[in-house]
């Protein structure tokens, strides 16, 4: 049985491939666009059966000429995830139409389809639950994800021929994101800031939040891969699910966890947030005007629906997840 992973050389996709490998699954077709060549490193430690360029894959899907038999599932992680990309034509073709074509093909072939949606569909809301009235995207990236989620809702009412699951990823961090540049997680940037400068920067006060007090639902990519595989194991489940921890933690906590994990590797003692700020190991910079009105100062996944689907595993909190991530970066990137 063959499994297809799109975006396989990317951040979440490569972690799904790795998680499949840990189960002994290697009959995997990795689909990606390697024009950004350094992404190959994410797949170098993985076992796959074949690599297929994204554009060739799309062509074969649209013409129904993919040469693989007995496809067990498609994990669709290939998309433009740059929330600051305002090229609507590109975003809608790459994130919406590509996903729609894959959905149609998977339904025709009765293949389970698990795809990446995003918490960006909620915009600046304060309630993050999988309900239409709570979804107000702030940018074309969020809209591209929102629009496809509406397609799934309509298809579910009409009746599906095979499983379809959309995961609304919250703030994901972890190994294999180094190619993402400015779109990599804050934890990634803090690690490199601290190693290079000896301190990290956080946004100052904005939108009623104090220095570094803006909060996010930070979720480890290890947990994201586990949830994807849980639904792969349960093809009877379809729908749209938030994928976060259900906890909202301050950027201050993330920065402190990153700095302290780096300090621990240097044989230095853990410091409190107050001490880190006093010693200027955490510094605050003015909130950028370009982000005002477009920035989510608070996110927290309502994971009630995920739990009702039977997923019982606990999620890493920021400290535990960042400790693991920093150790990985020290071993692989430093």
From Swiss-Prot:
Pfam families: Epimerase. Binds 1 NADP(+) per subunit. GO terms for molecular function: ADP-glyceromanno-heptose 6-epimerase activity; NADP binding. Signal peptide: none annotated. Substrate binds at residues 171, 182, 189, 203-206, 216, 295. It catalyses: ADP-D-glycero-beta-D-manno-heptose = ADP-L-glycero-beta-D-manno-heptose. Pathway: Nucleotide-sugar biosynthesis; ADP-L-glycero-beta-D-manno-heptose biosynthesis; ADP-L-glycero-beta-D-manno-heptose from D-glycero-beta-D-manno-heptose 7-phosphate: step 4/4; Bacterial outer membrane biogenesis; LOS core biosynthesis. NADP(+) binds at residues 11-12, 32-33, 39, 54, 77-81, 94, 145, 172, 180. It is an enzyme of class 5 (isomerase). One of its GO terms (biological process) is ADP-L-glycero-beta-D-manno-heptose biosynthetic process. Its EC number is 5.1.3.20. Belongs to the NAD(P)-dependent epimerase/dehydratase family. HldD subfamily. Catalyzes the interconversion between ADP-D-glycero-beta-D-manno-heptose and ADP-L-glycero-beta-D-manno-heptose via an epimerization at carbon 6 of the heptose. Homopentamer. Contains a large N-terminal NADP-binding domain, and a smaller C-terminal substrate-binding domain. This is ADP-L-glycero-D-manno-heptose-6-epimerase.
């Amino acid at each position: 049985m063959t499994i297809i992973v799109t975006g396989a050389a990317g951040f979440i996709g490569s972690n799904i491939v790795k998680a499949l490998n840990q189960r002994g699954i290697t009959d995997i077709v990795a689909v990606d666009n390697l024009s950004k060549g350094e992404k190959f490193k994410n797949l170098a430690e993985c076992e796959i059966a074949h690599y297929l360029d994204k554009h060739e894959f799309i062509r074969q899907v649209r013409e129904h000429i993919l040469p693989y038999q007995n496809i067990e599932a498609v994990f669709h992680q290939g998309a433009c995830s740059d929330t600051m990309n305002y090229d609507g034509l590109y975003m809608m073709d790459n994130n919406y139409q590509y996903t729609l074509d894959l959905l149609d093909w998977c339904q025709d072939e009765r293949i389970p389809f698990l795809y990446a949606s995003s918490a960006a569909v909620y915009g600046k809301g304060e309630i993050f639950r999988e309900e239409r009235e709570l979804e107000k995207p702030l940018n074309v990236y969020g809209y591209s994800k929102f629009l496809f989620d509406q397609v799934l809702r309509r298809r579910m009412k009409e009746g599906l021929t095979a499983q379809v699951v959309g995961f609304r990823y919250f703030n994901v961090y972890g190994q294999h994101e180094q190619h993402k540049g400015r779109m990599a997680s804050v934890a990634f940037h803090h690690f490199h800031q601290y190693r290079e400068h000896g301190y990290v920067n956080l946004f100052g006060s904005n939108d009623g939040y104090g220095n570094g007090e803006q909060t996010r639902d930070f979720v480890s990519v290890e947990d994201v891969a586990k949830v994807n595989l849980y639904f792969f194991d349960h093809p009877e489940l379809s729908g749209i699910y938030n994928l976060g921890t259900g906890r909202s933690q301050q950027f201050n906590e993330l920065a402190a966890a990153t700095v302290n994990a780096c300090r621990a590797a240097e044989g230095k003692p853990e410091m409190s947030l107050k001490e880190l700020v006093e010693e200027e190991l955490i510094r605050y910079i003015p909130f950028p005007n370009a982000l005002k009105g477009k920035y989510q100062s608070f996110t927290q996944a309502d994971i009630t629906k995920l739990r009702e689907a039977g997923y019982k595993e606990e999620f890493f909190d920021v400290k535990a997840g960042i400790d693991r991530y920093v150790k990985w970066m020290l071993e692989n990137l430093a």
